[in-house]
Amino acid sequence: MKQIEGGICAVRGVSAYGIKPGKMGIAVIRAEGPAAGVFTRNKVVAAPVTLSRERIETEHRLSAVIANSGNANAFTGDDGFLDAMEMASMVAENLGLDPDNVAVASTGVIGRRLDVSFIKEHLPEVLEGLGSSPECSRAAAKAIMTTDRALKESAVELDCGVRIGAIAKGSGMIEPNMGTMLCFAYTDAKVPADVLDAALKIAVDKTFNMVVVDGDTSTNDMVLFTSTCKSGVKPCLDCLDDFEEGLVCVFTDLAKKMAKDGEGATKLIEARVTGAKKYEDARLVAKTIVRSPLVKSAIFGKDPNWGRVVAAAGYSGAELEQERLTLSFSGGGEEVELVKAGEISTASDLSLLKKIMANDEIIINLDLAMGEESATAWGCDLTYDYVRINAEYTT
């Protein structure tokens, strides 16, 4: 498996484009084939999520996706649902598709009616620009950005020639439970919808569900996975693990980019938890660490306050014993042990620790010494800018 350029347009049979002339943007992705989806577990659900979930569960295939940024079309009642349907119908009519095979996604401010006239005005330009170049993938990725500072796309080619690519957006309001978080993934493997669904759920659980920026689960979270089947390669039973691994690789890349691009963030935090008795325990501890405001604040201040890490692990609800804990911080290729088997380490190099804390990526390694299970979670520091961005979001 190798990383390749091109984002979603690296996948055979995918064309895309997007524009963002102001606060609102529009992206369209044209790719036909079996499809699967994972959606927010928030009980307040945006209209596009309701519509797209119904279509995935009924049709198990997609021909296109239309996404807008700048307005979430959430908490907008029946009118919002009709607006989402109209968006799908406009794409279907212009491209000669069945509207039931067009998914809709939105991201932005909650509780405001979507300006459908904006979609009508600019959709022709987007459809005219549809193409399969790397620039077209980037244009679509840029169009769905809100408070994101960096474009998020990733693609790999498996040894068998199958390609998997995805674009995503997300920087705030991220704690997916399948953070706002949208992802559109594509492959050219010749696989049915049930295989896509199984691979998607595994990959999302290991990656996007392990990202925490601010602990808020959005009304609009959505991950869609479509196969164009254009490679002609049907992964055999022996290759399905490679297929799932490829999707996990793409999603891990995007998950880390989301965490690093958290609103106002200056540092990526990666919590690696090992030695858990159960996988769920490892997940709980890792996510609790990166969710902790005290840990996030300490990382922002370059303060190696490891007590906050063990405290977070302790209240996570996971099974652990403090006498067994071993903790270290690492970054920039260096590592300092802080706790060993429940005792404060006497080998800590404070000058090296200070150097590690100055890195823009900090890894927290915690061994529970209870078993063999492990998990990794990603988050970011909590900064003054996070408060400013979210205090001024609608004003």
From Swiss-Prot:
Pathway: Amino-acid biosynthesis; L-arginine biosynthesis; L-ornithine and N-acetyl-L-glutamate from L-glutamate and N(2)-acetyl-L-ornithine (cyclic): step 1/1. Pfam families: ArgJ. Substrate binds at residues 146, 169, 180, 263, 390, 395. Its EC number is 2.3.1.35. It is found in: Cytoplasm. The active site is at residue 180. The record marks 107-108 as: Involved in the stabilization of negative charge on the oxyanion by the formation of the oxyanion hole. The record marks 179-180 as: Cleavage. GO terms for biological process: L-arginine biosynthetic process; ornithine biosynthetic process. It comes from the Archaea. One of its GO terms (molecular function) is L-glutamate N-acetyltransferase activity. The keyword Membrane does not apply. Keywords: Acyltransferase, Amino-acid biosynthesis, Arginine biosynthesis, Autocatalytic cleavage, Cytoplasm, Transferase. It catalyses: N(2)-acetyl-L-ornithine + L-glutamate = N-acetyl-L-glutamate + L-ornithine. The keyword 4Fe-4S does not apply. One of its GO terms (cellular component) is cytoplasm. Belongs to the ArgJ family. Catalyzes the transfer of the acetyl group from N(2)-acetylornithine to glutamate, forming N-acetylglutamate and L-ornithine. Heterotetramer of two alpha and two beta chains. This is Glutamate N-acetyltransferase. The lineage of its organism: Archaea, Methanobacteriati, Methanobacteriota, Stenosarchaea group, Methanomicrobia. The gene is argJ.
